[in-house]
Regions:
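Active-site-adjacent substrate/metal-binding segments within catalytic domains
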Residues: 1-100, 106-114, 118-151, 155-162, ...
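Hydrophobic residues in well-ordered beta-strands that form the structural core
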Residues: 87-89, 182, 216
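Substrate-binding cleft/loops of secretory-pathway carbohydrate-active enzymes
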Residues: 159-174, 182-209, 224, 274-290
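Active-site-proximal beta-strand elements of phosphoester/diester hydrolases
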Residues: 27-32, 196, 214-218
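Short, acidic/turn-prone active-site loops that include or flank metal/cofactor-
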Residues: 91-96, 185-186, 200-201, 220
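Short secondary-structure transition/capping segments
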Residues: 77-79, 100-103, 192-195, 281-282
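Substrate-binding clefts and catalytic carboxylate motifs of secreted carbohydrate-active enzymes
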Residues: 133-134, 148-152, 206-315
Length: 315
């Protein structure tokens, strides 16, 4: 057995809000991690492989992973604990069939739905809502002692979302030691601790929320063509070569994300995504854990994020 001592919180400076670790401001630079594995699909092939994948993340300068709508074996969280990787944990969303066009329009227009309209959000059945609450409560109970978990995300992009303000406060009553991103993406009801933005098809343009931490919780999704695969796979933007991909990746961060720290008080960024999965090749690692760019380039980009943040929140 083991234990860890740490505190997660929210700090403020000059009207801008940020995350804190043990009372000190910290920029959280992370990757969206859907938890798929090359051969095991939902299950890591080996414990060593699970550990090594996390070491690779840390070696590139990232300090956070957003575990996307999946709960991992406790060993995975232990490895994050000992390696010093912060974890944002999504709840499982679920729900019934919803009006898909309402959700799919989110990346393109600011269409905010009323999440008390349970039918339109795929939560018309009271049993479905009760099942969600039971699973969310069980997730907190199961993972409560995982030191690395900083934040819970009850809902993502409106998928099965319902009464998110009340749900968030109910879960906060079960765990007051962590922060909450009550509705990650485009169905923000103004609650929780995070103003959570997903931006894919447009330039990164943000606005200081004045009450909550401003976080870019999904963006990017770049890839480059694999002419040998013969498969049609999804990415948000595709490039002709690894060199073009890496140049675009750096431009995205240096020209859009880094400036948003000083201009808007951006305090966290979660790039989509950690590794390629079936049907999506927009990871910074391939499915067999080969990095798509030089480690020093990723480290330099992350160093620029941290330096810009320190000038705003620490100096």
């Amino acid at each position: 057995s083991y234990f860890g001592l740490r505190s997660f919180g929210v700090g403020e400076r000059g009207g801008l809000h940020c995350f804190t670790l043990n009372g000190e401001p910290i920029f959280q630079s992370g990757l969206l991690d859907q938890g798929y594995w090359g051969k095991g699909i939902y299950t890591p092939e080996t414990n060593r492989g699970m550990y090594d994948s996390l070491r690779q993340v840390k070696a590139l300068g990232f300090n956070m992973l957003r575990k996307h709508i999946k709960v991992e074996p406790l060993l995975w969280y232990y490895y994050c604990d000992i390696l010093g990787i912060i974890v944002w944990q999504d709840m499982l969303n679920g729900g019934e069939r919803y009006k898909q066009y309402r959700i799919n329009l989110g990346p393109f227009i600011n269409l905010r739905l009323n999440d008390k309209n349970f039918e339109s959000m795929g939560r018309g059945d009271p049993k479905s809502r009760a099942q969600y609450m039971a699973e969310a409560e069980g997730t907190i109970e199961c993972l409560f002692n995982c030191v690395s978990i900083c934040l819970w995300t009850p809902f993502n992009e409106g998928w099965g979302q319902f009464d998110s303000l009340a749900v968030c406060e109910h879960l906060r009553g079960l765990d007051t030691t962590r922060l909450y991103d009550h509705a990650s993406g485009w169905q923000d009801m103004g609650g929780g601790d995070v103003c959570s933005r997903h931006i894919y098809f447009k330039k990164v343009r943000l606005k200081n929320d004045k009450r909550r931490v401003l976080a870019l919780t999904e963006f990017g999704g770049y890839s480059f063509s694999d002419k040998n695969s013969g498969k049609k796979v999804f990415s948000y933007r595709n490039f002709a070569s690894a060199q073009d991909y890496m140049k675009a990746f750096e431009r995205l961060y240096m020209r859009q994300v880094v400036p948003a720290i000083k201009k808007d008080g951006l305090a966290a960024a979660v790039y989509t995504q950690l590794a390629d999965v079936e049907g999506e090749i927009n990871g910074i690692f391939t499915a067999d854990w080969r990095c798509k760019g030089p480690a020093e380039d990723f480290c330099r980009i992350n160093a620029a994020l941290y330096a810009s943040f320190d000038l705003v929140f620490k100096v």
